[in-house]
Amino acid sequence: AWKDVSQVNDFSTLVMRGDRIGLVGPNGVGKSTLLKLLLGKLQPQSGNIRTGTKLEVAYFDQSRDVLEEDKSIADNVTDGKDHVVVNGQSRHVIGYLGDFLFPPERARTPVKALSGGERNRVMLAKLFLKPCNLLVMDEPTNDLDIETLELLEERLIDFDGTLLLVSHDRAFIDNVVTQLWVFDGSGHIDEHVGGYSDWHERTGGHKKAQKAEAPGQKSADKKPEAQP
């Protein structure tokens, strides 16, 4: 609960291997809280969470990894190693960074000289080196340029593990998830098969927007559509 408002209430579900789930709803309704509960970073006030065996989790949150400013792109990603292991195969770091749109001559550039979009690509390159079968991403599309957004989308489409994704980007959600957890702002979560467009067509987003109004907030004359 937060300020006497329950963010996740009486939610029971089963996540299967390979599920691709998008968490949608207005800001502050408990999406990040639920992710932290599932990851064991927070403890529930009631109920329990059971996890499967042999879970390997990679977590990308809104704060992002802190990059070492004076180190190069390559050294930030590999801790100074020349080779990385990707899907069981050894690759040279220069070739791997090419997958993230860094030309060879750019790989030795200090992070402090990078643009915001390049920094995001460095963090994604670090993330996808982690062996995982559960990928948890909290607002990964924030501050991404178009090239990096397309790169991330391709990576997630190719990912064959379980995905839990929080994002306000409707098209991105439609392209990478197969089911939704929709937060209504009162602690209740609805489960729906399909992406954001499927849910919106079936239920009408304006209804969810009304439910998601913050406690104590007065209704506006005209209700906006819900934002994921």
Where are the predicted features?
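ABC ATP-binding cassette signature C-motif
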Residues: 1-228
